[in-house]
């Protein structure tokens, strides 16, 4: 947590391997992610970032990441965990509904739940979330938090909403950390 501009998103992107640290190392499970290789590290992680988008394609494609022979049962399970399954079933073509630039318009909250379902489909051991539930009402956020907390996943969350912060086992207040000025 911390005020805007303190570096929460930047730190999260360094931790998930999207940005390289200017100094120091990123260690996960006692392994330096640079030494095991970013691609190897990313196989066990998933990210839901503020700027994430849905791709032009079906909801099946969007949740499975366009995986060949996507596991439909697991897609439905991920959607249920994200409290979006019932809404998908009400869409014109259910999971075959086309979304994205030319597809069905969906709300910001629906988009976030689909993006979280996509992340869960990867079966991550670490899930990085940057304001990933900011467009959700408290009920949907609570359902998702409870559902994910039942999984064996480490969540690293950037959030402003008190209920999201309260769901964490550990909280780091970045406004309390010494910051080094850019060189």
Regions found by a protein language model. Give the residues of each.
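Walker A (P-loop) phosphate-binding loop of ABC-type ATPase nucleotide-binding domains
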Residues: 3-6
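ABC-family ATPase nucleotide-binding domain "signature/switch" substructure
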Residues: 10, 44-46, 51, 59-62, ...
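Helix-to-loop junction immediately C-terminal to a conserved catalytic motif
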Residues: 16
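A position-specific signal in ABC ATPase nucleotide-binding domains
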Residues: 19-20, 27, 37, 164-167
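Conserved ABC transporter NBD signature motif
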Residues: 24-31, 41
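ABC ATPase NBD coupling module
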Residues: 33-46
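ABC-type ATPase nucleotide-binding domains, specifically the catalytic core motifs of the NBD
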Residues: 64-73
């Amino acid at each position: 947590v911390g005020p805007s501009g303190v570096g929460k998103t930047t730190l999260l992107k360094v931790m998930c391997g999207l940005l390289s640290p200017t100094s120091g190392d990123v260690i996960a499970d006692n392994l330096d992610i640079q030494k095991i290789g970013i691609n190897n590290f990313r196989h066990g992680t998933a990210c839901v970032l503020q700027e994430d988008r849905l791709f032009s394609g079906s909801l099946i494609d969007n949740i499975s990441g366009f995986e060949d022979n996507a596991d439909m049962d697991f897609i439905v399970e991920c959607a249920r965990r994200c409290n979006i399954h019932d809404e998908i079933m009400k869409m014109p073509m259910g999971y075959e509904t086309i979304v994205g630039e030319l597809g069905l318009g969906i709300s910001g909250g629906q988009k976030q739940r689909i993006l979280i379902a996509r992340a869960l489909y990867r079966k991550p051991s670490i899930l990085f979330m940057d304001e990933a539930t900011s467009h959700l009402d408290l009920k949907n956020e609570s359902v998702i938090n409870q559902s994910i907390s039942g999984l064996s996943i480490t969540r690293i969350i950037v959030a402003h909403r008190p209920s999201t912060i309260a769901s964490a086992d550990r909280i780091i207040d970045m406004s309390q950390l010494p910051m080094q000025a850019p060189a």
